[in-house]
C-alpha cells in the first residue's frame, strides 16, 4: 500500500511539473515542485518504517516471553483471575497461565509451600503468613455486598443490625421492620477470605450463628436467591439480579461509594508471592508489570473491581 502511494505521489509531482511548464513556469520552479514532492514521500516512508519497527518490536517482545504461571486461591477472585489470564496469554502467546479456586487460605498455603507461583487471597495476609516469607501484593479493591432474597422488603441495614443478625440475637425480619419471617443466615466456610473479611469488618469474628456454610461465592448467591428470608454476603463483582444487595447505613454498595470510603465493607484482592516480585521469574514479573499498566487496569475495571495506584 505504501509503495502504491509513493508511485501515485511521484506521478502527481510529474504531472504538476508538466502543467507548470505548460503554463510558462521556469524550469527552477518545476524542479522545486518535484523536490518538495520527493521530500513528502521520503517523510511518509520514514514514518511508516518507524511504525512498522515499533509493531515488530512489540511482537518480538511478546514472542520472546515464554513460560508458565500457576495461581491458586480465592473463589471470589475467579472472575479477575480468569480475565487476567486470558488477556495476558493473548498478549504473550508463549505464556500459559493456570488458576485453581480453592479458597484464600489454601492459596496462601500453596504459595508458601512453593507449589504455585501466586496465591490469590481476598483478604489481607496474617502476620504469621508474612513471617513465612509470603508477600502481600494488592492488585485491586473489592466491595463485599450483603444480599437478601428478592422478595425481602428490608433494603437497608445498619452495622449494629448486621451484628445482631449474624450473632443470632435478631431472628425475625419483623424485628427490623420487615415481614414476619425467620432470618436464614448464610455464610462461607471456615478459611474463606470473604468470610474472614466480612466477620472482621462487621466485628463478628468467631461469633456467627450460620444456618448454612457454603464453599463458594456462587453457592451463597444461589442459596440466598432460592431461600425466603435468607441473608448472605458475597463479592460485589459477583452480584447478579437474582438477589438484592442491601444498602448499609444508607449507603449503596457501588464502586463510587467504595472509592469515596463511605461504604464500609471493602477488602483487598491480593496476589501473594513467596518473596518480593523482583525475586520472581521473568514471566511472573511481567504479569505484575501488566497488572500495573493501563491495559491491565482496564481488565481489572472490566470485572467490576477498583484499581490501585
Give names to the regions the model predicted.
Residues 24-31, 47-309:
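Exported/periplasmic ABC-transporter solute-binding proteins
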Residues 12-17:
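Hydrophobic helical h-region of N-terminal Sec-dependent signal peptides
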Residues 36-44:
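Short extracytoplasmic/periplasmic juxtamembrane "stem" segments immediately C-terminal to an N-terminal membrane anchor
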Residues 1-11:
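Bacterial Sec-dependent N-terminal signal peptides
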Residues 18-22:
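C-terminal motif of bacterial Sec signal peptides marking the signal peptidase cleavage site
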